[in-house]
């Protein structure tokens, strides 16, 4: 996961995304990748909306597109009703959604998810799995999971 996202350089081989080599064109490739680590780096003192705006700026989402992309990401992840809540008040499942919404900003071609359901209760796992399944319509989804039941959401395992 760390090599595919550009966090770690490969000792051999290459990572190619849309015909571009990650080592030769890291910024261009990273713009096409959305990454959700197992423990998303969230700021508990921010509201959901503030965090999404912050993430959009970090991802260099053009200012004119920022509002639309933030609202769209919150809609996709079921966070519109939660946008004014502090992240620290959210359940683990909703905090995971906050990280996933931020991952979708910039409209990445590839979405890489590292253990997105770890620590969630059974209901939250089903909700996140359905959400991930819906992402397949617009993104290539790469998922790391130790839970084999997660395989039902994917075409290739």
Where are each of the predicted segments found?
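Helix-to-loop junction immediately C-terminal to a conserved catalytic motif
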Residues: 5
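Conserved ABC transporter NBD signature motif
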Residues: 13-21, 28-33
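Conserved ABC ATPase "signature" region
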Residues: 53, 57, 64-82
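Conserved ABC ATPase signature
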Residues: 86-90
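Hydrophobic anchor residue at the start of the ABC signature
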Residues: 100
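Catalytic Walker B motif of ABC-type/P-loop ATPase nucleotide-binding domains
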Residues: 111-115, 120
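Helical segment within the ABC ATPase nucleotide-binding domain
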Residues: 125-137
């Amino acid at each position: 996961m760390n090599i595919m996202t550009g966090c770690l350089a490969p000792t051999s081989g290459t990572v190619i995304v849309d015909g571009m080599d990650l080592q030769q064109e890291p910024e261009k490739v990273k713009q096409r990748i959305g990454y959700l680590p197992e423990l998303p780096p969230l700021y508990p003192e921010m509201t959901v909306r503030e965090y999404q705006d912050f993430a959009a700026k970090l991802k260099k989402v053009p200012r004119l597109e920022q509002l639309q992309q933030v609202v769209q990401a919150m809609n996709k992840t079921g966070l519109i009703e939660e946008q004014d809540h502090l992240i620290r008040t959210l359940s683990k499942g909703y905090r995971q959604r906050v990280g996933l919404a931020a991952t979708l900003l910039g409209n990445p071609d590839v979405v890489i998810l590292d253990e997105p359901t770890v620590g969630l209760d059974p209901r939250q796992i089903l909700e996140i799995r359905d959400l991930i399944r819906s992402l397949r319509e617009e993104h290539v989804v790469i998922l790391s999971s130790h839970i084999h039941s997660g395989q039902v959401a994917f075409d290739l395992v």
